[in-house]
Amino acid sequence: MKVGIDAGGTLIKIVQESQQGRSYETKLTTNISEVIAWLNANTFESISLTGGNAGVIAENLNVDATIFVEFDASSKGLGMLLKEQGHHIDEYIFANVGTGTSLHYFDGKQQRRVGGVGTGGGMIQGLGYLLSQITDYEALTNLAQSGDRDTIDLKVKHIYKDTEPPIPGELTAANFGNVLHNLDVDFSPANKLASVVGVVGEVITTMAITVARENKTENVVYIGSSFNNNPLLREVIEDYTVLRGFKPYYIENGAFSGALGAIYLN
């Protein structure tokens, strides 16, 4: 059995692979001591680590482990998952949406980091808490799914009420820009959270398609743990990517790209 671990700032992603198959598991980074104890209590053919807390795990193991650069590991694992899921694209931007978001260009041979932005799961959870007092990510994203952004976000269609707009009416003109026009409305926690997910998704997409245009590719691949239990984020990102004329790809188990890639870089 080989094990690959991507120890991030919020979550630890674990992939185990053998001739019998592959398994995926997630642990909170606050439980890193449990992961270390589990590794020390079992025997593995190899232990491959990546992510910001990889060093913490490695220095507490009773056996040797190999640490790989997170970006290279994610690129390797993503390439495998793309092929396994039938996506045969040679070059693309990939956005790794974790606590924050890192953007990379893959040219068919290697990845190059081309940018990043502080919006991601951390903003959803942090700003989401400030607006709703909900600390649990799953409860927060569950509530966001039922929200309506129309009374909070100002869209192009709200500005061009009686005339044909020069750009698609569903585009957001100003996130949270419709609030002062609707002060007589009860802004429910669900609507607030939906708008938080909306701004996160739109900022990530805008950054991703900007670097896609700069690198002359129409393909944008989205991975990361922020999509866990968050179909609204996926919907916002995919719809906005298409609306801007690019091709979005969402990869199942994409959050485990780093852990999987670390195994195969070893």
Curated annotation (Swiss-Prot):
SUPFAM superfamilies: Actin-like ATPase domain (SSF53067). GO terms for biological process: coenzyme A biosynthetic process. Belongs to the type II pantothenate kinase family. InterPro entries: ATPase_NBD, Type_II_PanK, Type_II_PanK_bac. Pathway: Cofactor biosynthesis; coenzyme A biosynthesis; CoA from (R)-pantothenate: step 1/5. It comes from the Bacteria. ATP binds at residues 6-13, 99, 121-125, 137, 225. It holds the Pfam family Fumble. The active site is at residue 70. Catalyzes the phosphorylation of pantothenate (Pan), the first step in CoA biosynthesis. It catalyses: (R)-pantothenate + ATP = (R)-4'-phosphopantothenate + ADP + H(+). PANTHER family: 4'-PHOSPHOPANTETHEINE PHOSPHATASE, PANTOTHENATE KINASE. This is Type II pantothenate kinase. It is an enzyme of class 2 (transferase). Homodimer. NCBIfam families: panK_eukar, PRK13317.1. Keywords: ATP-binding, Coenzyme A biosynthesis, Cytoplasm, Kinase, Nucleotide-binding, Transferase. It comes from Staphylococcus haemolyticus (strain JCSC1435). Disulfide bonds: none annotated. It is found in: Cytoplasm. GO terms for cellular component: cytosol. Its main location: cytoplasm. Its EC number is 2.7.1.33. GO terms for molecular function: ATP binding; pantothenate kinase activity.
